[in-house]
Swiss-Prot record:
Domain comment, as recorded: Comprises two domains: an N-terminal domain containing the nucleotidyltransferase activity and a C-terminal HD domain associated with both phosphodiesterase and phosphatase activities.
Cofactor: Mg(2+); Ni(2+)
Catalysis: reaction(s): a tRNA precursor + 2 CTP + ATP = a tRNA with a 3' CCA end + 3 diphosphate; a tRNA with a 3' CCA end + 2 CTP + ATP = a tRNA with a 3' CCACCA end + 3 diphosphate
Keywords: ATP-binding, Hydrolase, Magnesium, Metal-binding, Multifunctional enzyme, Nickel, Nucleotide-binding, Nucleotidyltransferase, RNA repair, RNA-binding, Transferase, tRNA processing
Name by which UniProt lists this protein: Multifunctional CCA protein
Function: Catalyzes the addition and repair of the essential 3'-terminal CCA sequence in tRNAs without using a nucleic acid template. Adds these three nucleotides in the order of C, C, and A to the tRNA nucleotide-73, using CTP and ATP as substrates and producing inorganic pyrophosphate. tRNA 3'-terminal CCA addition is required both for tRNA processing and repair. Also involved in tRNA surveillance by mediating tandem CCA addition to generate a CCACCA at the 3' terminus of unstable tRNAs. While stable tRNAs receive only 3'-terminal CCA, unstable tRNAs are marked with CCACCA and rapidly degraded.
EC numbers on record: 2.7.7.72, 3.1.3.-, 3.1.4.-
C-alpha cells in the first residue's frame, strides 16, 4: 500500500503558492485494510476515508467510466490493482494530474509523478486536458473557467478550448444540476479575477447556456459620457473585478454581477440610454436566482442593489426625506449590515468604469451618516407618546427620522 498527495497540493507547491487543498490517493489497498488502520469510510459512490488523526480525505485509487449524460452518470472501479497513473488519467487538467509519495510520517518524498506533462504546462501557463475522458464530465468546463479566475495569466490550450466548445454544442452543459453550477460560479466569483471565468465560459459558449442573462449584456451599448467602456458586459466584468480587488464578500460580488441585467432588454430605439433598467433587472434576477438555487443572502442583497443602485448613485442630489425613503425601501434600518454591503456593491459599480477606477464615491459616506442618524431615533418613545393614536405612529417616526437626517448631513428636509 502506498499513499500519494495528488492534484492541487502538488500544483500549488510547484507554483510556490500556499497549499489550499490536500487530496490523497491510496494505491494497493482495500477498504478492509483502510478500516484496519482506523480510517473511517465516508464516500457514497466510491471509497473515501477520513484519516483517524488529521481527518483529511484519502481515496482509494480508481477508474471511472461514463454511463449517462451529466454530472452523475459515472461507474467507478476500485481495487488494489488500479495504478496511480490510471487514477491520474481520469483527472481534468494536466496541472492537476501530478502526485508525490507520502511517507509514514506525512512528508512528501521522491520525485513528482507527472505522466501527462503538468510541469511543462505550468511553465507555459496553460490549461490542458489530460485525455479523452475530459468530455465525460461537463463540470470540468466550469472548473477550467474557475481556475482561469484564480490563475488569470493562464490560457486555455487550443485543443482543450475546442473540446469544451464541442461539449457545449453536444448539450453536456445542459445536464448540469443547478447546485453544482452555483457552487462553481460562487467559487469562481471569490477568486482574484472573476472576469476571467466569464471570459472562458463565453468563449466556449457555456455562458449562454448557464447564465444567458449575463451573456446577453455583451454588445449592449451605454452612454459613453457615463460609461467610457461603453459595452455593458465589459462594465459588469470591471465591476466584479473591482469587488474582488477590494476583497468583498460573495453576496457583494454576486450583486455586482447581476445589478445591470435589465440593460439587455432595453428597447433598441432608446439605446444607449437605459431608463427603467433597474426594475427590469429585478424581473430577470428573480427567476435566475430560483433556477440556480442561489442562497437567500446572495439573492436578497442582489435584489436590493439591482432595484436601488441608480438611487444610491444620486443621493448627493437628495434631501433628507428622499434619503430616509431610500433607507426604508432598502430595509437599511432593520438590516444595516446588508445595507453596508449594498454600498460596497454600488461603489464597485461606480468604479467599474474605464478610467474611473479610483474616482471618489462620497455617496457611501453620506448614506452611512444618514443611516446612523435615522437609527438613533427612538421609535419606541415616539410610539409610547402616541399610545392612544396608533395610526399616527408610523408617520411620526418617519418625520423624526427626516429631521435627524437633515441635521446630521446638512441638507434640507
Amino acid at each position: 500500500m502506498k499513499i500519494y498527495a495528488v492534484g492541487g497540493a502538488i500544483r500549488d507547491a510547484l507554483l510556490g503558492l500556499p497549499v489550499r487543498d490536500r487530496d490523497y490517493v491510496v494505491v494497493g489497498a482495500t477498504p478492509e485494510q483502510m478500516a484496519a488502520q482506523r480510517f473511517r469510510p465516508v464516500g457514497k459512490d466510491f471509497p473515501v476515508f477520513l484519516h483517524p488523526d488529521t481527518h483529511e480525505e484519502y481515496a482509494l485509487a480508481r477508474t471511472e467510466r461514463k454511463t449517462a449524460a451529466g454530472y452523475h452518470g459515472f461507474q467507478f472501479y476500485y481495487a488494489p490493482d488500479v495504478t496511480l497513473e490510471q487514477d491520474l488519467v481520469r483527472r481534468d487538467l494536466t496541472i492537476n494530474a501530478m502526485a508525490r509519495e507520502v511517507s509514514p510520517d506525512g512528508a512528501l518524498v521522491g520525485p513528482v509523478v507527472d505522466p501527462f506533462g503538468g510541469q511543462a504546462d505550468l511553465r507555459a501557463k496553460l490549461f490542458r486536458h489530460v485525455g479523452d475522458a475530459f468530455v465525460e464530465d461537463p463540470v470540468r468546463i466550469l472548473r477550467v473557467a474557475r481556475f482561469a479566475a484564480r490563475f488569470a495569466e493562464f490560457a486555455v490550450a487550443p485543443d482543450t478550448a475546442a473540446l469544451m466548445r464541442a461539449m457545449v454544442d453536444a448539450g453536456e452543459v445542459d445536464a448540469l444540476v443547478p447546485e453544482r453550477v452555483w457552487q462553481e460560479l460562487a467559487r469562481g466569483l471569490m477568486e482574484a479575477k472573476p472576469s476571467r471565468m466569464f471570459a472562458v465560459l463565453r468563449e466556449c459558449g457555456a455562458l449562454a447556456r448557464i447564465l444567458p442573462e449575463i451573456d446577453a449584456l455583451f454588445g449592449v451599448p451605454q452612454r459613453a459620457d457615463y460609461h467610457p467602456e461603453v459595452d455593458t458586459g465589459v462594465h459588469v466584468m470591471m465591476v466584479i473585478d473591482h469587488a474582488a480587488k477590494q476583497g468583498y464578500s460573495l453576496p457583494v460580488r454576486f450583486a455586482a454581477l447581476t445589478h445591470d441585467l435589465g440593460k439587455a432588454t432595453t428597447p433598441a430605439d432608446v439605446l444607449p440610454r437605459h431608463i427603467g433598467h433597474e426594475g427590469r433587472s429585478v424581473d430577470l434576477l428573480k427567476p435566475l436566482c430560483e433556477r440556480l438555487r442561489v442562497p437567500n443572502e446572495c439573492r436578497d442583497l442582489a435584489l436590493v442593489v439591482a432595484r436601488e443602485h441608480g438611487n444610491l448613485h444620486r443621493v448627493m442630489e437628495m434631501g433628507a426625506a428622499a434619503l430616509v425613503r431610500l433607507l426604508e425601501r432598502a430595509d437599511a434600518l432593520r438590516k444595516p449590515a446588508r445595507f453596508a454591503e449594498a454600498l460596497q456593491a454600488s461603489e464597485a459599480d461606480a468604479r467599474g468604469r474605464l478610467g474611473l477606477e479610483t474616482k471618489p464615491y462620497p455617496q457611501a459616506e453620506r448614506l452611512r451618516q444618514a443611516l446612523v442618524a435615522a437609527r438613533a431615533v427612538d421609535a419606541g418613545a415616539i410610539a409610547q407618546g402616541l399610545a392612544g393614536e396608533p395610526a399616527k405612529i408610523k408617520d411620526a417616526v418617519h418625520r423624526a427620522r427626516v429631521r435627524a437626517v437633515a441635521q446630521a448631513v446638512g441638507v434640507a428636509d
